[in-house]
């Protein structure tokens, strides 16, 4: 379960503090999915970074399962990210010195859940079979996005945070990725929180909320 309570975040600017998130409350049960929508600059990506423990809120609390993020130190947060969550952000952060096949397995191996059969299934579903021996610099943006998604899914995370995971994909590949995400939700207790601008993508998930001016509506 993911539970966010009264979360607030501001950033300093020359004109003074800029409120980005104002009193966000959000709850997701294990195995559920939520599409987070809203205009650019509304705080969607900031919310995902806070939930991932990559930034600190000014106030409020975030609880994932038994973990309260505001009570964890950097080492504990890093271990939690490795073992329990999958991240697909707009910066794909693939490891340049590793081939695609090793990038795919990297997160799962760190989490101690590397499953060659599941990885093979992901490779087939994401259309990566011909790319396994390539390095990230040899891939297009859309190909890198598919690898990043495969890496996040390979460990069957308890919580998957995805920021525009289909943004660089054509419609056919986007539909295949969504089918794969829904399949993962059916087969595992993974909880999905996805940022998307696409009404078509959001409509495939169980629930939708809109973030506007730092508040959920």
Where are these regions (language model features)?
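Conserved switch/coupling elements of ABC/ABC-like ATPase nucleotide-binding domains
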Residues: 213-217
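ABC family nucleotide-binding domain
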Residues: 2, 7-211
